[in-house]
Structure formats: C-alpha cells, structure tokens
Amino acid sequence: MIRRVRVTVRVSRACRPHHVRIFVAKIVQALCRASASINQGTPFQVLLIVRKKRHRGRSGHDDGQCTPGSNPVAVRGGTQHPRPDNPHPASPRRCPGGLPGHSDAAPSGRGAAGCQGLLGSPACGPRRGTRTPPRGRIPARGGEGRLNDTVQEAQ
C-alpha cells in the first residue's frame, strides 16, 4: 500500500532564521502484520525524503550549514603558512629534500621512522636521549655522577 504523508519540516540554520517547509511524501507501507517490521522504517524513509528535498537546487548543502557568502566554499589553495613571521617556507609538508627547515632530516618517503610506525616529524619531539634535564637537577647518568664523586674525594 502506498501511503501519502504530509511532512512538516522546520529547518534551523546557524546564519539564517528558521523556516518551515511542508510537502507530501509517498511512502510504501506493508499491509500484513507479518511484515510489520517494514513499517518501522517509515521515519527513516521520511528523513531521506526530507534530506533530498531540502536543498534540491544546491548540491553539497545537505547538512543545514551555510557559508557566510553565497558562493560555495573554495578549495584551500593558499600557502601552508600564510603568516609572515613564520620561519618555515611556504612549501608542501614533505618535499624532495625532507622536511622544510630541516636539512639533516630523512628524505621524502617514510624511511626508518616509517618502519617504526612513527611520523618522524619534529612535532613528535626530540629523539631519545637528547632531552635537557629539568632545572636544578643533575642528570643521573653513569659518567657524570662518578665525576662529581671523584672530585669530592680529591679535595
């Protein structure tokens, strides 16, 4: 059985006032009780129809959001670092010489860092064993601690 349903939709948007749309939708509905589980999909069918009819003329605007202007959002094609005070050049993240601003970095591709499952970029932090100790503490490594002990014994 085809059932005609009157659907009233109140569309709320971030940058425009609410507006109401009313239309008639045709929904196929099961007649027998054995296939009553098909009838539970009726709200889902209504939502699909509402989404299709909401912005029929405009493609890509089916989630209720809108851009500040009337033009669709342009593809990001500007430089990666638009600020003038940024020390890194405006180049792709990985270029043939490695990471921008790091001449001793691994060449493009995953390299040894990729084999370990790490990104290998400076954002991951310094490599193991290169961190500076916290202020006011002497690092507890083998050679440095013994050096301080021998200096105290000699005095």
Swiss-Prot record:
| Processing and modification events after translation | Ubiquitinated in normal cells by TRIP12 via the ubiquitin fusion degradation (UFD) pathway, a process that mediates ubiquitination at the N-terminus, regardless of the absence of lysine residues. Ubiquitination leads to its proteasomal degradation. In cancer cells, however, TRIP12 is located in a different cell compartment, preventing ubiquitination and degradation.
Q: Which Pfam families match?
A: P19Arf_N (PF07392)
Q: Which GO terms describe its biological process?
A: apoptotic process; negative regulation of cell population proliferation; positive regulation of apoptotic process; protein K63-linked ubiquitination; protein polyubiquitination; regulation of cell cycle; rRNA processing
InterPro entries for this protein: Tumor_suppres_ARF
Which stretches of sequence are listed as region Disordered?
55-155
- Top-rank taxon of the source lineage equals Eukaryota
Enumerate the residue ranges of region (Interaction with CDK5RAP3 and MDM2).
1-59
Tissue specificity, per the record, is: Ubiquitously expressed. In the testis, expressed in both somatic and germ cells. Not detected in premeiotic spermatogonia but expressed in both meiotic and postmeiotic cells. In primary tumors, low levels detected in melanocytic hyperplasias. Higher levels found in non-metastatic and metastatic melanomas.
Q: Which GO terms describe its molecular function?
A: DNA binding
Gene Ontology cellular-component terms listed: nucleolus; nucleoplasm
Per the UniProt entry, the effect of P126L is: In some primary melanomas and melanoma cell lines
Cell compartment(s), UniProt = Nucleus, Nucleolus; Nucleus, Nucleoplasm
Query: Mainly localized where?
Result: nucleus
Keyword entries, A-Z: Apoptosis, Cell cycle, DNA-binding, Nucleus, rRNA processing, Transcription, Transcription regulation, Tumor suppressor, Ubl conjugation, Ubl conjugation pathway
Q: Where is the composition biased (Low complexity)?
A: 125-141
Q: Which parts pass through the membrane?
A: none
Q: How does it assemble?
A: Does not interact with cyclins, CDK1, CDK2, CDK4, CDK5 or CDK6. Binds to BCL6, E2F1, HUWE1, MDM2, MYC, NPM1/B23, TOP1/TOPOI and UBE2I/UBC9. Interacts with TBRG1 and COMMD1. Interacts with CDKN2AIP and E4F1. Interacts with CDK5RAP3 and MDM2; form a ternary complex involved in regulation of p53/TP53. Interacts with NOP53; the interaction is direct and promotes ARF nucleoplasmic relocalization and ubiquitin-mediated proteasomal degradation. Interacts with TTF1 (via the N-terminal region (NRD) and a C-terminal region); the interaction is direct and inhibits the nucleolar localization of TTF1.
Record function comment: Capable of inducing cell cycle arrest in G1 and G2 phases. Acts as a tumor suppressor. Binds to MDM2 and blocks its nucleocytoplasmic shuttling by sequestering it in the nucleolus. This inhibits the oncogenic action of MDM2 by blocking MDM2-induced degradation of p53 and enhancing p53-dependent transactivation and apoptosis. Also induces G2 arrest and apoptosis in a p53-independent manner by preventing the activation of cyclin B1/CDC2 complexes. Binds to BCL6 and down-regulates BCL6-induced transcriptional repression.
What's the protein here called? Tumor suppressor ARF
Q: Which organism is it from?
A: Monodelphis domestica
* Lineage, highest ranks first: Eukaryota, Metazoa, Chordata, Craniata, Vertebrata
